[in-house]
Amino acid sequence: DRCPTSDITFDGQNRAFSNCRNLATQSARIAWNLNLINESSHGTLEVFFVGTAPSPSGWVGWGINPSGLAMSGTQAFIAFSAPNGSTILTFNVSEDVKSGIAPLRCTPISLDVVSMAVQISGSVISTLVVLQIDPTITTSSVNLVWNRGASVSNFQPAAHGFTADDLASLTAVDLLMSASVPQVTTHSPHSLLKDVSWPY
């Protein structure tokens, strides 16, 4: 379900994105710009994500899993209100976290992050993340995972709910349909962005 790109505002400014999509669950929305310069220069993937937490004290998160279409291995960005203000942190969602053996703690991730920003209005949480893309990569296919939870304690997000809306979402989006692509590129022309909800 495509959405208009003209009504996206972040930090008081209108933002232009090549693509926008309403996700199938949790009233979440994602918009992105994929900028590929040439074969020898790094490109960028700019991602705007907005979701609604179950409560003002809750969290919203999304991430990319470089290893497959699954929750375990997701390199995540989770945002919430903290005592020091609106916060967005990185989390490596390991198999131990998925299994409930280990808590979800802020950790470095494998993605090359250029910048992160967040704005929160009540329970609505918007994030803006810019990632750097390696020019030697042979595919621009990524797996996107998202979810939300009702509370955060000591900067550790609590587990999300287990309703059907929390557990079931799957779609595919062609990142390159409206991307800024050079005339000569090694990137796959049929790359897909796959989305799946975040089941703990």
Locate the predicted segments by residue.
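Extracellular-facing/secreted segment signature in eukaryotic proteins
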Residues: D1-P199
